Amino acid sequence: MSTSQRWTQAQARALFDKPFLELLFEAQQVHRQHFTPGEVQVSTLLSIKTGACPEDCKYCPQSARYSTGLESERLMQVQQVLDAARKARDAGSTRFCMGAAWKNPHDRDMPLLEQMVQGVKAMGLETCMTLGMLNDRQVQRLAEAGLDFYNHNLDTSPEFYGSIVTTRSYQDRLDTLSKVRQAGIKVCSGGIVGLGEDIRDRAGLLVQLANLPTPPESVPINMLVKVKGTPLADNEDVDPFEFIRTIAVARIMMPRSHVRLSAGREQMNEQTQALCFMAGANSVFYGCKLLTTPNPGEDRDMALFHKLGINIERRTATQGDVAQQAQLAEELLTADTAHYYNAAR
C-alpha cells in the first residue's frame, strides 16, 4: 500500500481551494480507481475501559481533568467484550474496535487484551484496538495475539496540536504508529475537524498522514462532538461543506486507504452523509454509541444505505486468517474459561 508520492502543504491547499463540485468529481474518480463504488466497510467501536484518563485532550469527555458527568468504568471482563463483538458481527459489522481511555496500557492488563483480540478474531471479525501509546513489547504481544489494526490518531496538524493536547507530543504519536507498522499491524490514524483549526491545519494533518512511509489503511475523519464540560464545548459548528471537502481531499491524497466517516454523524443529516460518501468516504462506525458519544443506530444506517444503494463491504479472509480463526476457536472451546469472567481491573 506504500506510495512514492510525497505531498506538500501547497499541493494539499490547492485541493482544498478547488471549486466544491470539481473537488467531489475528482475524489469520486480516484475512489473508483481503487474501490468498488457503493460499498462501505462497517466497524463497531466499544469502550472497554471508560473515563479517568490522565491526558488533557481538550475535546475528550474521558479526561479526568474535566467535569463532564461521565462515570468512569474499569476494564471490561473479557466475556462481556466477546458478547458485544458477537452482537456486532450478527448486526453486520466486519471489524470490531476496542478502545480504552489510557495514556498507555499497564503490563498487567496485556493478558486480558490478548484474550479479547483472540476471542474476537475467532469469530471471523477483523480486530482493532486503541489503547494509547505502546512500548515495543506491548506492540509485539498484540501482534502475536493476531491484532489486525491499531488506531492512534494524529488529531490535527503539528502546528496546531499543542493548542489541543500537552500530555503527549506529536512525535509520541508518530513513534507509536511506527512501532505498530514495524510489528506488522495495520495502521488506523486520522483526525478531528472542528477543534478550532483552519484550512492550513486540515491540510497539514492530511500531509502528515499521506506522507507516512506507508499511509494508514484506515483514515477516520471525525467531526468534533462538543461535550459540555470540555474546553471545546462552545466551539463553532463545522460548516458541512468544509467537512465534506476534508473527506474529499483525504480520498485524493490517500487513494488506497479506507476513509472513515467517523464521530459526529449523529449531527449530520442524510444529505451531508450522502455527499461524504460521494466524496470518497467508504467506512463508518456502526452502532448507537462511539465510546461515550451518540452515533446513528443500525436501523437508521441501514435505511440510509438502502436509499443510497450502498452495500456493506464483505471481508475476504486470507488463508492465514482462516487457519488462525480455527486454531483460536479450538483453544477457546477447550480452555478453562473461568478467567473470562474475572478480568476486571
UniProtKB/Swiss-Prot annotation:
Its EC number is 2.8.1.6. Belongs to the radical SAM superfamily. Biotin synthase family. PROSITE patterns: RADICAL_SAM. The keyword Transferase applies. Homodimer. Pathway: Cofactor biosynthesis; biotin biosynthesis; biotin from 7,8-diaminononanoate: step 2/2. Keywords: 2Fe-2S, 4Fe-4S, Biotin biosynthesis, Iron, Iron-sulfur, Metal-binding, S-adenosyl-L-methionine, Transferase. [2Fe-2S] cluster binds at residues 97, 128, 188, 260. It is an enzyme of class 2 (transferase). Its cofactor is [4Fe-4S] cluster; [2Fe-2S] cluster. It catalyses: (4R,5S)-dethiobiotin + (sulfur carrier)-SH + 2 reduced [2Fe-2S]-[ferredoxin] + 2 S-adenosyl-L-methionine = (sulfur carrier)-H + biotin + 2 5'-deoxyadenosine + 2 L-methionine + 2 oxidized [2Fe-2S]-[ferredoxin]. [4Fe-4S] cluster binds at residues 53, 57, 60. This is Biotin synthase. Catalyzes the conversion of dethiobiotin (DTB) to biotin by the insertion of a sulfur atom into dethiobiotin via a radical-based mechanism. Residues 38-256 form the Radical SAM core domain.
